[in-house]
């Protein structure tokens, strides 16, 4: 333990000498004395015995203190001690004097902090603009909106004034009615109160008058019953009188008059000779021209077929059939595949119309043939009937 106590004054003297050197040395010397690993001033302040605290920081303890060798332990070599001291950030005043000039992570952190502060500033400014607005940019909105020329025309203003005046008039009428009704109610209320008071005071008088009221009611009921019975008798007598008068008039009128009236009523229904019954032909009925046709297209095409004309095609309106035929002969057609497709559609539609027209012609022909057969059969039957009746008459 005696060698340890002897070495303490030597350590104090060495630390004071090193502090003086550090304070007296120029900045160029300090920069050159930094270790290549970024350890700072560890090589200047680190001694063989251990680390010394920097000037002005007596209370700060080193992060990695090097303990003295105890009894029975081997002390560390000098190079390892200096490296350990130089690697610590607080050793030799490194924490207080180094500016991180060559550290890229420190520069990135500084830039991030600046960006974050700028964002916060911009956010606060935007919130302020959203709340208060920016009159230097947009200007303040007008307190009273300007009247629009389309919305506020003089005619509309007059109509609005009339409506407002009529509504005011109706409101005044309602108010007067309500005031009258309230006055009447107020007038009625005291009368009820008076009546109640009178009723309470003269309860005995009312008990005596109740019997009189009942008698009056019974008399009124009897009168009503008698009146109803008289009315029923009058109605019965009127009905009987009417029946008797009708019977007497029937007896007086002859039967010929009734026959003439019925005949005249029957003749009034139909005036003039009856029209002959005409069988509706199939030509008048709407014919189905097939599917995939526009409404009215089939009928319009059938009209051209009936007239014996060529059905006009798309783009041929205003041209005669002869002009169209001459154009087709000279080689004017639609362009390419579209012409082929349009031609196919046109041919299909025309075939539908022609087939429908042929069906109609066949149906009309069959109908005419049937009518002819029926007429022949009817004529032969009439001749046969006439012969038989004539032979009987001769006998």
Curated annotation (Swiss-Prot):
One of its GO terms (biological process) is spermatogenesis. It is found in: Nucleus. Pfam families: NKAP (PF15692), Nkap_C (PF06047). It comes from the Eukaryota. Specific to testis (at protein level). Detected in differenting spermatogonia and early spermatocytes (at protein level). Interacts with RBPJ, CIR1 and HDAC3. Transcriptional repressor of Notch-mediated signaling. Required for spermatogenesis. This is NKAP-like protein. It comes from Mus musculus (Mouse).
